[in-house]
Every structure is written in C-alpha cells, then in structure tokens.
Amino acid sequence: LYSSAASDVYKRQVLSSFDAARDLERFYPGHRCAVEVVHFVSYIEPEVCAITPELEQSVRDKFDLKRNYIYIPNQFWQHKNHIVMVEAIECLLKEGRLCDYDFVFTGNLKDYRNPEYIDKLRKIMESDTVCANIKLLGFVERTEQLAIMKNAQFIVQPSLCEGWGTVLEDAKVLDKVVLLSNIPVHQEQQNKKCVLFDPHDPKQLAETIARTAARASLPEHEAEYAGDIEQGIANMYREAREYSRALERVFL
C-alpha cells in the first residue's frame, strides 16, 4: 500500500502503531515524510448497549452455545495463524483436557490465496479428535459477534501480523481476557488482561489455554473473566480522547 514515491507526494504519514513505523523505516529507509503514530480506538458503545439479556439468549440458542467456550474471532487468512490454534486444540483434546469446552470460530473458512492452507486447517478441524468441540459459525452480524465475545470465557488472537488489531480493541471495551501472540504490535497494544504466547508453538499455546481455563473456572476469578463493561467503556472514552488529541495535532 506504500509506494516508493509516497514520501515525495505526502509530507506526513499517519500510522496506527510504532511497529508499523519501524516497518516503514525498514522497508523505505530513504523516505522524507514526517511520521505520526495514532492508535485508533473501537467505538462500540451503541453496539454494546444493544446486547440485552434477550439478545444474549437468542445468540446462545441460534449458535447452540450451551457449554463454556473460547472464542477465536478472526478471518481465516493465513497470516491470522489459525493453524497454531487448531493444533493446540488437537493437543488438548488428545490428552483429554478441556473436553467439556467448545472452541468457537467466526469468519469464512476460505482463502483464495492459500487454498492448501485452508485444506490443512479443515483436515484437522473435521478430524474425529476435535470436530465435536469446534463450532464454525461463519459470518455473523456485528452485535451478535460482540455478544459471542462478551460471553466467551476468553479470546485467543494468534495472528502473525497485525496493524493495530480491532479484535483486541473490541475485547478491551468488553474488558475480556485475551491470549495474544507475542508479535511486536501486540506487545505494544496489550493491556493488563492480555497473556502473550509464542504463535509458532502449539504446545505452549495449549498449556496457556488450559491454565487460563482453569483460572477462569475458579469462583474467585469469575468477575475477572466476565469483564467489567462499565470500566471498559470508561477506558474507551479515555483512549478516544487521546486519539482525538493526536488527530488534532496531525491535521490542525
């Protein structure tokens, strides 16, 4: 998306992370533009306020979400790295762990650029070992997606590459625990409810999932894993004010 002539055309580049700024310096060391990093914020208060108990029940019924579940919300593009997640699930279930959990995926199980990768994913997901514990919901409506996220035990985000992840920003507003791949942008974006893992190590991820699920099941940690949405929205407004001030510095 960034041409070699961009620095001759634009005097200023606005990027979503310091990690992206480092990439700019790495790939275009001769650029002459001023770089501004502005972290965007998910403004989802209207959608969150639309999540009523009735909607939550309808989502549970529609998608048959009767058991505790872990949510993986990304599209199935190869850089989103679902392979480490499904291999971790396979590892857990082969060892007889978390057999009473579901692993919920949204997004379309297609990637025209990497059909062999999708075939590899599908082979594991449809195997006898894991198929009973995996739910592929496809594309879901935005408010339904947030309701699914809200009621998950926790979220897993295994990406190998992100700009500034919307999934994590949404999870922050819902005040959810998120297991994050330890890529630089996630280290920059994480908050205190994030747990980092090596995105190339399914066994480490399996252990992190099992440990997090065990903690989530304890009564003394119930509130932590349910999330404090009121606090999440307050944090969203605080970060939105910082975002607005940053944009003012750039454009005014």
For each feature predicted by the language model, list its residue ranges.
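Nucleotide-activated donor-binding/catalytic signature segment of Leloir-type glycosyltransferases, i.e.
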Residues: 118-143
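Single conserved hydrophobic/aromatic residue that forms the stacking wall/gate
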Residues: 1-6, 10
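Short hydrophobic beta-strand element within catalytic cores of glycosyltransferases
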Residues: 168, 173, 177-180
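C-terminal alpha-helical cap of glycosyltransferases
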Residues: 210, 233-252
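Short alpha-helical donor nucleotide-sugar binding micro-motif in glycosyltransferases
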Residues: 147-152
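Aromatic "clamp/platform" in nucleotide-sugar-dependent glycosyltransferases that forms part
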Residues: 160
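Conserved acidic donor-binding segment of nucleotide-sugar-dependent glycosyltransferases
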Residues: 195-203, 211-217
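Conserved donor-binding/catalytic core segment of Leloir-type glycosyltransferases
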Residues: 64-80, 86-89, 104
